[in-house]
Amino acid sequence: MELKQIGPKTFCIEHDTNIGIHFTDDGRMYLIDTGSKGDGEKIDEILSREGWVPSCIINTHTHIDHIGGNEFLMRKYGIPAYCTDYDMAFAHYSELEAAYMNGGYPAEKLRTIFAHPGMIGFRSLEKET
């Protein structure tokens, strides 16, 4: 993972799934996506090194390679994660992602490949904006 500045207040942690970091004018830091399982700890190392504390996580969608680090970072920093109402269903029922990718209810092995932490505190982007 490598941190790169891509704008005056915007950074990217380059990885298999890029992680966005954006600072608001009032100094809040938004973390955009958190990679796969185990990436939360790696992201935290970068944040700690820079002295940054996230205000929240915004997930572009709830595929496992975008929310895998959520649980660790949410617990460590006591922050919420936001997603769209549409993706809230996928967050509630992780087998939906496997069914969506498979074109029907998936076999057992596919259900476990796409398994993720489920509802670990997602909030609706639509309802809070």
Predicted regions and their residues:
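Conserved beta-strand hairpin/beta-sheet module of binuclear metal-dependent hydrolase folds
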Residues: M1-E50
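Active-site HxH/HxHxD metal-binding segment of metal-dependent hydrolases
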Residues: I46-T129
